[in-house]
Amino acid sequence: MNQSRRILRTVYLSLFLIGLFMLINDIFSSNILSSKSSDKEVQFDLNKSFDDNEMSSVKSNSFNLINKSQDIIVETGIYVATFSTFKGNLVSLKLKNHLNLEKNPTDLINIDRKNETFFDISFDYFVDDLFLYKKIDDFNHEFKAYFKNNGKTYEYVKKYTFSKKDEYLMQFKVTVNGLEDYNLFDFDSYKIIFSSEIERLSDKAKLQYNNYLSQIIYYDNKLKYGKDGLRINNPRWIGSSTKYFGVLVSKENMEVEFKKERGTLKSFIINNVRNKKNISDEFFIYAGPKDNRYLDVFDKRDDNTFGLFDIFFGMSVEKSFWYLIQVPMQMVMQVFYDVIPNWGLSIIFLTIVVRILIFPLTFKGFRATAELSKLQPKMKELQAKFKHDPKKLNEEMGRLYKEEGVNPLGGCLPVILQLPIFFALYSLVNNLFLLRGASFIPGWIDDLSIGDSVYHFGYKLYFVSWTDIRILPFIMMFTQLGSTIVSSNMDLKNLGAQQKFLYFGMPIMFFFILYNMPSGLLIYWITTNIFTILQQYYIKMHLS
């Protein structure tokens, strides 16, 4: 076999593996809600809880209360929070510093106010009136109501405390006290239903972003994904997560059960009140970016307002297999950004640095290919002489390589060894929160976390799932074709049908695979192609 063609096939096999990796990663992320889990189940026995039929009987009054309810808007340095006097719950939580595609604050709560609340508590179904609101100070806000159960009257208070340091965390305290002279509650537990519907997206955003919504849980020092029927005792936290944002809940001595209702997976926080005279439960809710700069401050007591430590919210940021390679890459990107505050340029500079570092491998591979090319006449003679004896041909080929001091895999291995670097760069560019909303070229590449756009259709094209006309995929395709031609020593006129497909078909195939990929990734790919073209010209001049 022509050795140059073997090298070319190795290159395209590597590219195929890259495309397959990205396709699988995209499919997995889009369907992560159904990910399997090998979690252990911790059984618990709660013999008596609220009667579901009793709770449903009071729902008829809900619609009247919703119509009479009042919205309470609380603004902090980072949040615009909207509460409702109906159930005293959050109905909107906007992040002032993180804008959506429409350049409005991102709303982390995505619920239908008529049918669901974000933090649904069992006691809410017994309250047949609106909650009373009290502003204690700028950071503390209280909602109070009363309810009766089995002839007994209870005072029911929800208190929200925001961080004084503008951290993406609030304290949520539930207090229930009996107002009459009796000892213990006559129920064993109450539940909090934690909605998985987070991050409200516009129609345009739904077309641009894949559905990365998932229920996650951290226990036994591992991040796991929730699944229907899973029960866990005392996890460190549970939460709902999208690609870039998360809402995470932590509580001491928490029991959690995951259930699927009407096609949506929800987490039920079960709180044991057996043998208690009153209830005073404290929850800490992180609601913000999946960015370790904000998440890790709750691991050290002195770093946060609430004195929390070892919460490990930072584990909600999924770590890829190539994490150890990603860390220094991100540090290099940050250095470039500190000098020139443009993440697109940081990606370009990082790519150049990486290509320079792996240049010895590239040079070695090209030199091995050149050495093999010199042996082509002798190899053809052997192929003609032993064309009917494959075993003898392999022996003679091996002897020829040994005599000439040539490694037939010398041109392939450098290509394969570069794959982990690409995979690490892909994971970094595809998931780095700092690239969300980061503009490279205003009016064209406005957000490095999604594809570039010069025209938005407003719908998906049926056969190719395109939502926009994009320029970067075309540039990528032509530069990929150019780098392949320059990297090869073959005469294009003498190519067979198979080789022509490798040359011209593969770049076209990758055009479709990468069309909707984040523009940050395509900038990396294009920079790599251009660098490869210049690099190969230099190598050919040097070797000649």
UniProtKB/Swiss-Prot annotation:
Pfam families noted in UniProt: 60KD_IMP (PF02096)
Protein name: Membrane protein insertase YidC
The entry's keywords: Cell inner membrane, Cell membrane, Chaperone, Membrane, Protein transport, Transmembrane, Transmembrane helix, Transport
Keyword Protein transport: yes
Annotated function: Required for the insertion and/or proper folding and/or complex formation of integral membrane proteins into the membrane. Involved in integration of membrane proteins that insert both dependently and independently of the Sec translocase complex, as well as at least some lipoproteins. Aids folding of multispanning membrane proteins.
HAMAP family: YidC_type1
Transmembrane segments: 13-33, 343-363, 409-429, 461-481, 506-526
Similarity annotation: Belongs to the OXA1/ALB3/YidC family. Type 1 subfamily.
